[in-house]
């Protein structure tokens, strides 16, 4: 509307809730994601492009403060070499690209999905993780708060604090890991939220827009 375009509407993004689902959690996949850190208690995961704008380095203080946690980075990109240096001497496993059911299983097998980027309008990977029943932590900025209900289906951290959200991200991670029952509740709520964003809901919304447009022009 600011550009002079009238009669606009926002069509929600769809996520495949049939392929991304909690029952794909497996010990075999957890072993793959843990790699040589298989004796570690908790599995933190990130899925996506390894690029500077994703601000993945913000996860390092979490590993420094939670010795029992391992990070699996699923994906690849131009920032991988730099990240390997940043995460040197931490329990971080660079997995590379995964796809199909293997990717869906990776989401479902993680304990927490970390999405530190503060520049996202809406992260599809967040919805995929939630569809797989993985509690998520994302930035309290952009479109992320539209899908993360803080303390219910995941947690929000504040990336604009003086420490760039370091303590906020650490606290959110510890909060989820500290309470198994709370974590299981978040997992179920995450799945419920994702179901509101599935392709069936997105299609119904689009059909509604078409019907309203045709009705107004009749």
What positions do the PLM features span?
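Donor nucleotide-sugar binding/catalytic pocket of nucleotide-sugar-dependent glycosyltransferases
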Residues: 1-28, 39, 94
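Conserved donor-binding/catalytic core segment of Leloir-type glycosyltransferases
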Residues: 37-54, 60-64
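Nucleotide-activated donor-binding/catalytic signature segment of Leloir-type glycosyltransferases, i.e.
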Residues: 81-101
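Short alpha-helical donor nucleotide-sugar binding micro-motif in glycosyltransferases
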Residues: 97-98, 105-110
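Aromatic "clamp/platform" in nucleotide-sugar-dependent glycosyltransferases that forms part
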Residues: 118
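Short hydrophobic beta-strand element within catalytic cores of glycosyltransferases
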Residues: 135-138, 148
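A short, well-ordered alpha-helix in the C-terminal region of glycosyltransferases
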Residues: 182-196, 208
């Amino acid at each position: 509307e600011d550009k002079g375009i009238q009669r606009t509407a926002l069509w929600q993004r769809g996520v495949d809730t049939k392929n991304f689902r909690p029952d794909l959690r497996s010990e075999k996949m957890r072993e793959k994601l843990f790699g040589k850190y298989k004796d570690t208690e908790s599995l933190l995961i990130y899925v996506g492009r390894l690029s500077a704008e994703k601000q993945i380095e913000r996860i390092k203080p979490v590993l420094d403060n939670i010795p029992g946690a391992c990070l699996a980075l699923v994906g690849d990109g131009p920032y991988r070499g730099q990240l390997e240096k940043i995460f040197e001497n931490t329990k971080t496993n660079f997995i590379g690209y995964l796809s199909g059911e293997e990717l869906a299983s990776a989401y479902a097998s993680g304990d927490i999905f970390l999405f530190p980027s503060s520049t996202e309008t809406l992260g599809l990977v967040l919805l995929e993780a939630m569809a797989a029943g993985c509690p998520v932590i994302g930035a309290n900025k952009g479109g992320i708060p539209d899908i993360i209900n803080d303390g219910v289906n995941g947690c929000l951290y504040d990336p604009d604090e003086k420490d760039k959200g370091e303590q906020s991200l650490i606290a959110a991670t510890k909060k989820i890991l500290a309470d198994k029952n709370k974590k299981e509740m978040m997992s179920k709520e995450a799945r419920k939220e994702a179901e509101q964003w599935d392709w069936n809901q997105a299609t119904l919304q689009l059909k509604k827009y078409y019907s309203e447009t045709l009705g107004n022009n009749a």
